[in-house]
């Protein structure tokens, strides 16, 4: 090893040790229910194989951008290793693989003991390696995935393309919208079998709230637009017919669908990558730090975790090409830490910049009596309002309430220009973020104007006490930015200063996908960017 490379690797080991102490020296679970978890979901307790010491390419993360990258690399003949900190959860039509939003246990959350969601109802449980990581920063809670398949396991399934004019406003010409519209959005729609909610599902009992939502927005002068969705409608039909346990028709989604109702990445991109024989996913592999040697080879410090959080081993892996797909938070943490500690010394001044929440806000308004039992999960429709600040509202379900309350929930996405910067804390080895409380209030206010207009014209109640707030912008499920295209990277995700290093996920997006859910755009950009990378 070259002298410089030796010291860099030694530095990486020190950084990884500090990070392991900070991040998750997650305590081993003391949950007596772990024995039950082992009987319910034995698959996640199977021995975890070690990732190979060296691979042509390593992909960190297994969400939308990472999964696209793994498949397209494999198809190009490039052997790749996918590293995922979370477990690989199976699906079954009858077993309760995942916990519910209403009375969750440790399977729901990544090594935490309490959670207060959008309903503002506090819940407690014992720590375990569950699927949803709630990362708390000053001013904002960020929801992100910890499972093989990433966000596709826990999101609500809506995959919508933004309008060109708003997309261009956000991306500033770095990405050609026409190219996405003509090539990459259609490719993703085909790969993920996206389509609108069928009429029989829409008119079923669990979607009475969707029909009432549409009636109210029409009364207010809006025309609801149908959403494309990743749900497999035949699985919902099985639920309605009683030939599968209720999940997507019974307010379950944020913590996973046991019966595989969502056509998540384990059923498409990751599966297809594995079937090439040139890509393998390694669950329980948390990446703590990254470096580049003088030779150009990359070093990845990894901790292998049991579902309980116990660290089973630590190793340094190497690769020729390194693709970051750990999501806005995970990718930004790795890059900011590497820049601060000198393991990637040539990163530019834009690393850590451009974080935004996609303008997320959850709203609730009342309704007249709804003839239904519980709320179905898939979002049937949306409206867009440009009368002031551009806002999209989507028909949503109320997480954690499996019965019908008469409330109608919306997920709002506001065109919010606010951006924040990730910073490194040398004393702890952690990476932090400050989010403005004033921004929270502004986002909530912009969405509230639209929701109140609907409530007023539909004769509904705008303030709904069961949710604690009529508008809650204290969280985001759509973190974006931190390594933005055209700034920290070139226009295709190649990281400036470190050839062979790429950003392939939501960290590359400048804080917003222009008032729609980010998943379709993240996936389409990954398709576009990996195609350019492979061209050379």
Give the role of each language-model region.
Residues 1, 21-56, 75, 90, ...:
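C-terminal segment of N-terminal export signals and the immediately downstream linker at the start
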Residues 173-286, 472-479, 484:
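Conserved redox-cofactor binding core of oxidoreductases
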Residues 125-144, 151, 155, 169, ...:
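FAD cofactor-binding and catalytic pocket of flavoenzymes
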Residues 5-27:
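N-terminal export signals
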Residues 57-81:
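N-terminal Rossmann-like FAD-binding beta1-loop-alpha1 element of flavoenzymes
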Residues 283-296:
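A conserved short coil-to-beta-strand element within the FAD-binding core of flavoproteins
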Residues 102-199, 409-418:
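Redox-cofactor-proximal catalytic regions of oxidoreductases
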């Amino acid at each position: 090893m070259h002298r410089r490379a030796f010291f860099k690797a030694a530095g990486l080991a020190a950084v990884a040790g500090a990070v392991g102490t900070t991040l998750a020296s997650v305590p081993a679970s003391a949950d007596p229910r772990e024995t039950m978890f082992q009987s319910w979901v034995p698959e996640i307790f199977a021995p975890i194989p070690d990732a190979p010491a060296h691979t042509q390419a390593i992909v960190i993360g297994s969400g939308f951008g990472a999964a696209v990258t793994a498949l397209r690399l494999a198809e190009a003949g490039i052997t790749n290793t996918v590293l995922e900190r979370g477990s690989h959860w199976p699906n079954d039509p009858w077993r309760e693989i995942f916990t519910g939003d209403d009375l969750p246990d440790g399977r729901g959350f990544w090594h935490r003991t309490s959670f207060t969601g959008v309903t503002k109802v506090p819940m407690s449980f014992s720590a375990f390696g569950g699927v949803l990581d709630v990362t708390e920063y000053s001013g904002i809670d960020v929801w992100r995935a910890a499972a093989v398949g990433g966000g596709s396991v826990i999101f609500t399934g809506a995959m919508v393309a933004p309008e060109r004019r708003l997309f261009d406003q956000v991306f500033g010409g770095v990405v050609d919208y026409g190219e996405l519209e003509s090539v990459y959005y259609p490719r993703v729609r085909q790969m993920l079998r996206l389509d609108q909610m069928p009429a029989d599902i829409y008119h079923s009992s669990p979607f009475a709230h969707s029909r009432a939502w549409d009636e109210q927005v029409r009364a207010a002068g809006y025309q609801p637009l149908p959403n494309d969705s990743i749900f497999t409608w035949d699985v919902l039909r099985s639920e309605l017919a009683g030939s599968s346990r209720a999940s997507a028709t019974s307010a379950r989604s944020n913590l996973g669908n046991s019966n595989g109702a969502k056509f998540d990445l384990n059923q498409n991109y990751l599966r297809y990558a594995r079937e090439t024989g040139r890509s393998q996913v390694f669950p329980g592999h948390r990446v703590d730090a990254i470096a580049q040697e003088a030779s150009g080879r990359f070093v990845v410090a990894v901790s292998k975790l049991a579902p309980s959080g116990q660290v089973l081993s630590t190793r340094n892996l190497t690769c020729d090409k390194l693709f970051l797909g750990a999501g806005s938070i995970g990718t930004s943490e790795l890059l900011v830490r590497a820049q601060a500690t000198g393991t990637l010394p040539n990163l530019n001044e834009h690393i850590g910049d451009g974080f935004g929440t996609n303008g997320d806000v959850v709203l609730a308004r009342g309704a007249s009596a709804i003839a239904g039992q519980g709320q179905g999960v898939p979002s049937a429709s949306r409206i867009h309002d440009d009368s002031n600040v551009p806002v999209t509202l989507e028909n949503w379900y109320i997480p954690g309430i499996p019965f019908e309350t008469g409330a109608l929930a919306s997920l709002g996405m506001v065109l919010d220009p606010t951006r924040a910067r990730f910073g490194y804390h040398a004393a702890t080895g952690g990476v932090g973020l400050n989010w403005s409380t004033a921004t929270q209030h502004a986002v909530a206010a912009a969405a509230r104007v639209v929701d109140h207009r609907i409530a007023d014209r539909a004769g509904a109640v705008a303030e709904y006490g069961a949710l604690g707030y009529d508008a809650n912008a204290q969280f985001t499920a759509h973190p974006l930015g931190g390594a933005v295209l055209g700034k920290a990277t070139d226009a295709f995700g190649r990281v400036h200063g470190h050839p062979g290093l790429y950003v392939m996920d939501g960290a590359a997006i400048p804080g917003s996908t222009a008032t729609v859910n980010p998943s379709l755009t993240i996936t389409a950009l990954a398709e576009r960017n990996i195609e350019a990378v492979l061209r050379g």
